[in-house]
Amino acid sequence: MPKRVLQGVVISSKADKTVTVKVERKFKHPIYKKFVKVSKKYAAHDSENKYQEGDKVSIIESRPISKTKTWVVVNGE
């Protein structure tokens, strides 16, 4: 099964080797036909501590690194 890749924005980089990434998605509501924006936060592994708040990054699914981290930052802008 291919690994999922998501794009988002770093909203916290306070923890060591960990960043919190906010991923937003839009979809059309099936009944009301209005576009709805939904966001979710992911804890991602940043081994070099090189990403700061506000950076746009891509994260990829990986094996569990800790209790809450199952994503790794692969690149940023």
Swiss-Prot record:
Intrachain disulfide bonds: none
One example of a Gene Ontology biological process annotation: translation
GO function terms (MF aspect): rRNA binding; structural constituent of ribosome
Keyword Thylakoid: no
GO cellular component entries: cytosolic small ribosomal subunit
Keyword terms: Ribonucleoprotein, Ribosomal protein, RNA-binding, rRNA-binding
UniProt-listed InterPro entries: NA-bd_OB-fold (IPR012340), Ribosomal_uS17 (IPR000266), Ribosomal_uS17_bact/chlr (IPR019984), Ribosomal_uS17_CS (IPR019979)
UniProt entry tagged with the keyword Ribosomal protein: yes
Superkingdom field: Bacteria
General function of this protein: One of the primary rRNA binding proteins, it binds specifically to the 5'-end of 16S ribosomal RNA.
UniProt xrefs under NCBIfam families: PRK05610.1 (NF004123), uS17_bact (TIGR03635)
Subunit description: Part of the 30S ribosomal subunit.
Family indicated by similarity: Belongs to the universal ribosomal protein uS17 family.
Protein name according to UniProt: Small ribosomal subunit protein uS17
